[in-house]
């Protein structure tokens, strides 16, 4: 499982011009699922991301986690995180999980984050989405379960 995590002042996702998820201060998480991923990876990645100390304390040092700052999370499915561009000019997505597994683990990830006490919004799995954000810092990390 792979995630691109961006610290944001705000983020929003639209489907067909209609807002389906929006947050204020928090994290935008683009989430990709691999074929071998299980609930174990979901649990690990959700806890890791929620606990990342990437928000600034009063001294300007990245020392606080999402829950410590009362932040929110917007989770967007992103199978293209497993795109392989090493051959040719068109990416191959054979490294991404099949849609049925990816959707199941994506929803499980959202549920785990929610159970950790984080207000969570989502995009729409499998839809063409417009994602907008105000990246704060910028702070952008790639977090993987393996």
UniProtKB/Swiss-Prot annotation:
Full protein name: D-aminoacyl-tRNA deacylase
The family this protein is said to belong to: Belongs to the DTD family.
Catalytic activity: glycyl-tRNA(Ala) + H2O = tRNA(Ala) + glycine + H(+); a D-aminoacyl-tRNA + H2O = a tRNA + a D-alpha-amino acid + H(+)
CDD domains: Dtyr_deacylase
Keywords: Cytoplasm, Hydrolase, RNA-binding, tRNA-binding
Residue ranges annotated as motif Gly-cisPro motif, important for rejection of L-amino acids: 137-138
Any one GO molecular-function label of the UniProt entry: Gly-tRNA(Ala) deacylase activity
InterPro entries, per database record: Daa-tRNA_deacyls_DTD, DTD-like_sf
Signal peptide: none
Top EC class, one word: hydrolase
Keyword Iron appears in the UniProt entry: no
UniProt main location, coarse: cytoplasm
Entry domain remark: A Gly-cisPro motif from one monomer fits into the active site of the other monomer to allow specific chiral rejection of L-amino acids.
GO CC annotation terms, alphabetical: cytoplasm
Organism: Desulfatibacillum aliphaticivorans
One Pfam family, short name: Tyr_Deacylase
Keyword tRNA-binding: yes
Role description: An aminoacyl-tRNA editing enzyme that deacylates mischarged D-aminoacyl-tRNAs. Also deacylates mischarged glycyl-tRNA(Ala), protecting cells against glycine mischarging by AlaRS. Acts via tRNA-based rather than protein-based catalysis; rejects L-amino acids rather than detecting D-amino acids in the active site. By recycling D-aminoacyl-tRNA to D-amino acids and free tRNA molecules, this enzyme counteracts the toxicity associated with the formation of D-aminoacyl-tRNA entities in vivo and helps enforce protein L-homochirality.
Domain of life: Bacteria
Summary of subunit composition and partner proteins: Homodimer.
EC number of the protein: 3.1.1.96
GO biological process: D-amino acid catabolic process
Cell compartments where the protein resides: Cytoplasm
